[in-house]
Swiss-Prot record:
Keywords: Aminoacyl-tRNA synthetase, ATP-binding, Cytoplasm, Ligase, Metal-binding, Nucleotide-binding, Protein biosynthesis, Zinc. This is Isoleucine--tRNA ligase. It catalyses: tRNA(Ile) + L-isoleucine + ATP = L-isoleucyl-tRNA(Ile) + AMP + diphosphate. IleRS has two distinct active sites: one for aminoacylation and one for editing. The misactivated valine is translocated from the active site to the editing site, which sterically excludes the correctly activated isoleucine. The single editing site contains two valyl binding pockets, one specific for each substrate (Val-AMP or Val-tRNA(Ile)). Zn(2+) binds at residues 894, 897, 909, 912. The lineage of its organism: Bacteria, Pseudomonadati, Campylobacterota, Epsilonproteobacteria, Campylobacterales.
Length: 921
């Protein structure tokens, strides 16, 4: 007789194959229809006091999403959901950075030469259209990743009210005396024709000249030094800046020597100079650097005076100890010359070409002006080397790390121009500087990983004043009026507040569209004819750094609280958004805009190399979704240590898919074997059920603690190990007999099912933030015992901890089972047995014999566990001097359960016989 139909076999409609790529979009559509999921998450937590606000760092509204975008938004989604499922009120308003050079450049590429014929208003409208287009594209792409957010009400930095809030933040900083316009060298992108902030500069390898040039000291200076002739030898890597040389800097505290040949070097670097054959090394005179102050040298290019000055920035780690100083082309140069009231000369225009300043200031001889004016600086190096003649002691090329514009990818220069700066060291904030207060406030912020605080603090400690002005069209204007005559900037409250109102209504375009008289408040005391507009725009980092003000600190968005619970971005944002947000918030409100900062690394290929189209190693999130499913991308994030760079490739995604398959199969087994449970036991568990509940509690608590610290890969590693080693590897296997063969309401069967239900509930709650799709799907197929009152995943609540606590000394259990199956592998290989059910396990272990022997037999998956007798053994082993003996069962195989417990061949064992008889009663 075939007893298969008499068994309670597992049954579930939850599919084994996930078919993610096809089915995910359908479920996502349901989540996003009428903003269902996000609105439900808000509604479910109405009246809850504990909240979590993750403030979204805005990506650029330009281009399609790459894998880094996916990593960032999915990680945010997981963390927000983790707090939601813990019972907190959560808010996540996504946003976009809509201004700035990347968008303007894309518009220029489309326009080509037509740009010259367009007004600023027309250019700005085209930029707005471009940004709007990519906001919609990226929003759809983010939604296709299953990220839950307030997609119907995102924040856009180009909205009228938003531009007004950005400008309002600028005005607040100006009123505190922290804003200053001055001429100073700043990073300048000649390719973009604009100033850059530090955060907009990236470093790449660049080949440059390394040259040593001798400047003859004038006769009066030589006389003061008591020598017939002397030459100050400088080293530079920027020959093109030599026409603008105004000084030569020396370290006041270092010793300098004049060699027999008349060359001046730092004594500490003399050996290097000998190695270069500049000198034989014979010293004519030795002096301190301070003794050279205010002497004069002659620039060999133009015969202009170059003053010898002192500066602490002169180091002894290379060169000659004498530094070519052009105050228009370097920050150290600028500050050194400032002390001596030396003029800042800037002979380079905004496109990187020499201009008429060469003629006006006599920076090159008359006969060379036609050749150099209009020449790009980087094309001038070789010609300048020729013109130096004998003054050029050495010229060579070398490769070094050099600043490049982050958007044009062209090398930048230092160029002195009139710019607007937020001052870092003016003590205007309750007697403290912005630098001091920002560093002080950072102490209240928790960083993940902890090393982030040192990184951000170091950047704040060492950063210069923040250059916030840009010479472009697409951005929020630095909308100030200047008196034409006095050049004084008007910081009048009535004027500034009136402009805020205009921007709220009409947007910042009004600054270009309206005449001055229409921008002033009614009955203004200022005569519009005496005023002119400042036409610079704000650095986009000021835009994004003000988002806390416009989004969290205004009533315009239901976006959560200021200060935000968390800012979460890539590690590059220490120098970008984290820093700009900190400075603006501290300047205005004397506190940080965030309580926690979490950073993640960058995505690289499986070899750790940066992704690029040329290498063919780019992984697109759209392709991952199409080929594997978004759930695989989410699981990849959970399994990766995101505090460092994250490796991703097809091979890695295949491995993640295999892990997902195991998780899904475990869920399926739990659903299939609890489909008919009607009563959940919470107290009277069998030994094996207590054991799995104990192991579950340990794993769940470690996992939960790791998740609380956002150490997802650590937590997931423990969770997956529990699922594969304990739950699937042991427990679910050993439970099959009682689940399939015992009576439906048998206490042992109900005990096992109940343990599975309790584990499934907690497992689903732990997985819901990361594998939201899978858990939502699983709940549709789950018995009410598992899902309780949940209609979908957004009804779940993850209660802290796991209340089912049991203490079982399982060391002997584990060790003996491992050894037993090690021996069984050999017995099966040698074809001595086909199944462990053919066996009895004999032991002298009281620890095992004192328990329910049916349970212990299930633990080893044998038919009987008993005391050791004289029966012949197939194998023997010892664990901690406790004997175990494997013998063939003396009973017969039960045709229903296959255990060797039947007294006669072909007959049912007592258990199966009882179950079948009960059905017929």
């Amino acid at each position: 007789m075939d007893y298969k139909d008499t068994l309670l076999l597992p049954n579930t409609t939850f599919a084994m194959r996930a078919n993610l790529a096809e089915l995910e979009p359908k479920r996502f559509d349901k989540w996003f229809e009428n903003n269902y999921a996000y609105e439900k998450m808000k509604q479910k937590r109405q009246g809850v006091s504990e909240s979590f606000t993750l403030h979204d760092g805005p990506p650029y509204a330009n281009g399609h999403l790459h894998i880094g975008h996916a990593l960032n938004k999915i990680l945010k989604d997981i963390i927000i959901k983790m707090h939601y499922f813990q019972g907190k009120k959560v808010r996540f308003t996504p946003g976009w950075d809509c201004h700035g050079l990347p968008i303007e450049q894309q518009v220029e590429v489309k326009l080509k030469d037509k740009k010259q014929n367009l007004s600023k208003k027309q250019i700005r409208e085209l930029c707005r259209e471009h940004a709007r287009e990519f906001v919609n594209i990226q929003r759809d792409e983010f939604k296709s990743l299953g990220v839950i957010a307030d997609w119907d009400e995102p924040y856009l930095t180009m909205k009228n009210a938003f531009e007004a809030d950005i400008y309002k933040a600028l005005c607040k900083i100006a009123k505190k005396g922290l804003l200053l316009e001055r001429s100073k060298p700043v990073f300048w992108s000649w390719a973009a024709k604009s100033a850059l902030a530090e955060a907009e500069v990236e470093y790449e390898e660049k080949e440059d000249y390394s040259i040593y040039v001798a400047f003859n000291l004038d006769e009066a200076s030589c006389k003061k030094l008591g020598v017939e002739n002397a030459k100050a030898v400088i080293w530079t890597t920027t020959p093109w800046t030599l026409p603008a040389n105004q000084a030569i800097s020396l370290n006041p505290n270092e010793k300098y020597i004049i060699t027999k040949e008349g060359y001046i070097f730092a004594k500490a670097l003399l050996e290097n100079m000998i190695n270069k054959n500049f000198t034989q090394g014979e010293i004519q005179k030795e002096l301190l650097g301070s003794e050279f102050e205010n002497l004069s040298a002659i620039n060999p290019l133009n015969q202009r005076k170059s003053t010898l000055i002192l500066g602490e920035h002169v180091l002894m780690d290379g060169g000659t100890g004498l530094v070519h100083t052009a105050p228009g082309h370097g920050e150290d140069d600028y500050y050194a010359c400032l002390k001596y009231n030396i003029e800042v000369i800037m002979p380079v225009d905004d496109g990187g070409y020499y201009d008429e300043t060469l003629r006006a200031k006599g920076l090159l001889p008359e006969h060379l002006l036609a050749e150099f004016i209009g020449l790009h600086i980087f094309k001038a190096n070789e010609r300048i080397l020729e013109l130096l003649g004998e003054a050029l002691l050495e010229s060579s090329k070398f490769t070094h790390s050099y600043p490049f514009c982050w958007r044009t990818h062209k090398p930048v220069i230092y160029r002195a121009t009139k710019q607007w700066f937020i001052l870092m060291d003016e003590k205007k904030l309750d007697g403290k500087s912005l630098r001091e207060l920002a560093l002080e406030q950072l102490n209240s912020v928790k960083f993940y990983p902890e090393s982030g605080v040192k990184r951000l603090s170091s950047m704040i400690e060492n950063r210069p004043d923040w250059c916030i002005s840009r010479q472009r069209d697409w951005g929020v204007p630095i909308a100030f009026f200047r008196d034409k005559k006095s050049q004084e900037v008007i910081f009048d409250d009535d004027v500034l507040d009136h402009l805020v109102g205009i921007f709220e209504k009409n947007g910042a375009d009004a600054w270009w569209d309206l005449e001055i008289k229409d921008l002033l408040p009614p009955n203004s005391k200022y005569n519009p004819n005496n005023l002119e507009k400042v036409y610079d725009i704000l650095d986009v980092w000021f835009d994004s750094g003000s988002t806390w003000e416009a989004v969290l600190n205004s009533a315009r968005y239901d976006a959560g609280e200021y200060q935000a619970s968390m800012y979460l971005e890539g590690s590059d944002q220490h120098r970008g958004w984290f820093q700009s947000s900190l400075l603006i918030s501290t300047a205005i409100n004397h506190k940080t805009p965030y309580k926690n900062i979490l950073t993640h690394g960058f995505t690289v290929d499986e070899k750790g190399q940066k992704m690029s189209k040329s290498k063919g190693n780019v992984v697109l999130p759209q392709n991952v979704a199409k080929n594997y499913g978004v759930e695989i991308l989410r699981l990849w994030i959970m399994l990766s240590d995101y505090s460092t760079d994250l490796k991703i490739s097809d091979n890695i995604l295949k491995q993640v898919s295999e892990q997902y398959r195991k998780i899904r199969n475990t869920i399926r087994f739990l659903l299939a074997n609890t489909n008919d449970i009607e009563f959940v036991e919470t107290k009277n568990f069998t030994l094996l059920d207590k054991w799995i509940l104990m192991r579950a509690k340990i794993a769940f608590e470690i996992c939960e603690n790791a998740f609380e610290k956002y150490e997802f890969s650590k937590g997931f590693s423990v969770l997956l190990n529990f699922l594969s080693a304990d739950l699937s590897g042991i427990y679910l296997d050993i439970c099959k007999d009682r689940l399939y063969c015992n009576a439906k309401d048998d206490s042992k069967r109900v005990s096992a099912q109940s343990a599975m239900v309790l584990i499934a509930r907690k497992l689903f709650a732990l997985l819901a933030p990361s594998l939201t799709y899978t858990i939502d799907e699983a709940l549709e197929h789950a018995n009410v015992a598992i899902k309780e009152n949940a209609k979908d995943v957004f009804d779940l609540l993850n209660k802290q901890g796991f209340e089912y606590e049991y203490k079982i000394e399982d060391e002997l259990f584990i060790k003996s089972r491992e050894k037993f199956f090690e021996i069984i592998d050999g017995l099966k290989k040698d074809k001595i047995i086909k199944s462990t059910l053919e066996l009895s396990l004999q032991t002298s272990a009281n620890e095992l014999l004192s328990e329910d022997l049916e349970e212990i037999a299930d633990w080893f998956m044998v038919s009987v566990v008993e005391s050791i007798d004289e029966q012949k053994a197939l194998a023997e082993f010892k664990i901690d001097n406790i004997g175990f003996k494997i013998v063939k069962s003396s009973l017969n195989k039960c045709p229903r359960c296959w255990k060797f417990l039947a007294k006669e061949d072909g007959c049912l064992c007592p258990r199966c016989n009882g179950v079948e008889k009960a059905k017929n009663v």
